[in-house]
Every structure is written in C-alpha cells, then in structure tokens.
C-alpha cells in the first residue's frame, strides 16, 4: 500500500482599510515594533499603491533616519541600523536573478522588504508576511495582510 503525504501551509489573514497616509503610517509604525532578525515582508500592489510609502514609514518606525526611496532601478537598497533594512524592488526580475544574490539578504538577520515579491516567489521562505495594497481612491487603500508561521501572531496584532 502506498501513502501520499502533503503539507498544508495555514495562514492568518485579515483585511483593513486605511483612509490616508496617517493611517498607513500608524500601521507601519505598529508593525515596526514587532520586527525581528530575519523578518520577511512581501508587498504587492499596483504602481502608486503605497508599497514604498509603507516601507518609508516602517523604516522611520525602526529608527532609520536615512531617506528611504524606491530601489526600482538598483533592485536593492540597504539601510544600516541596529536591525538592517534590505529594501528590494524586484519588478524587473524573472526568478531570483543570478547577478543580484538577493537570497543572501532575504535570509539574512535584518528586515527584508520585497516589493513585487511574486517575481521571486520560489526563492522566498515559507514563513513570511504579505501585504497586498489595493487603491480605493485618492488616499484610501484596502490592505489584505497574510502571515504564516511566526507571522500569524503579528497579523492578529495588526487587526485593529
């Protein structure tokens, strides 16, 4: 007799509406207090949805004073701090991209924020926090936040 084994990854998922940048800042600041070495945050959303804005607020919440801007053309920006921030924009990549060695940062002891994460999904750890940002108006955004493993409790804490 043969047996087939499979695993199911369970995730905690919530949906939130942020009315403006102040709400976005409050959410990112709350999240910044729960970061740990090896934290992986995946961001998805249309152009202009607020992925980089969220990352700026997250960095400020971490105490980073450098200007945080989009790494669209550089792929990766590193902000050194007590807990380093590795900010990636992988929109232009298909797969991990051998020239960039991004896995070195994804699995490092800092905080890794990845915009357009679906382009390198197969290179990501099973446990991660995913935030999908949808535009609902000039300033309003609908966020779907999903976490697996260690990130499930963080999702619960963000459910305000």
Question: Which role fits each region the language model picked out?
Answer:
Residues 11-28:
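N-terminal pre-Walker A segment at the start of P-loop NTPase domains
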Residues 48:
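Walker A (P-loop) phosphate-binding loop of P-loop NTPases
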Residues 14, 60, 105-160:
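Short phosphate-coordinating micro-motif centered on Lys-Gly-acidic
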Residues 41-43:
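Hydrophobic anchor at the beta1->P-loop junction of P-loop NTPases
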Residues 78-118:
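Conserved nucleotide-sensing/catalytic segment adjacent to the nucleotide-binding pocket
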Residues 51:
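Conserved lysine of the Walker
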Residues 64-79:
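Short beta-strand-centered segment that lines the nucleotide-binding/catalytic pocket of NTP-utilizing
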